[in-house]
């Protein structure tokens, strides 16, 4: 069985946000409860021998136990679980790296065993991995992936879809929004604004700049945009 779904791409492109919210859509469609189990990076432990393996095994044990209770003899589960591993390269980095610490290597083995246990039992669990560094993921984890999705920076239509409603509410017209879409496309290097650049930086900056009693003006928005830079391109390192 092929278990994990892997989402990769630059920071700020929505990988984690989608993973944390997709369960709501599934729950509504299937009329079941869906629970998110985020795997904390604390499972890497402090480096003591056997600690990472023990923590990862405990995380999978807890997930397996909860998922077993959701199985029904009718075949349709009473609920589902999303087992989310954000920054997955920190937990599943390639064992082909000659400089990899023994404890990290053992942790990858424990992770693979945990994924295989869930898959073999055909439990209602979706394992979702998010990473900025696809080449850093262990080949055995990649082979097990049911799907690998590439997340990139939003295009013109996508950026407009993100900013149109809030900017319209602030009094911007269509021509104003077109100009902001153009200015967030990036320069000659083609590095445009990410989703989080728009939602967590640009829009809040416009509001805070006008606080407490000034209107948000198009001319001022352009001034801010000329200073506000998009998240730099993520340069993915190759494993040793």
Q: What kind of feature is each model-predicted range?
A:
Residues 1-178:
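Walker A/P-loop NTP-binding motif of AAA+ ATPase domains
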Residues 156-240:
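C-terminal alpha-helical "lid" subdomain
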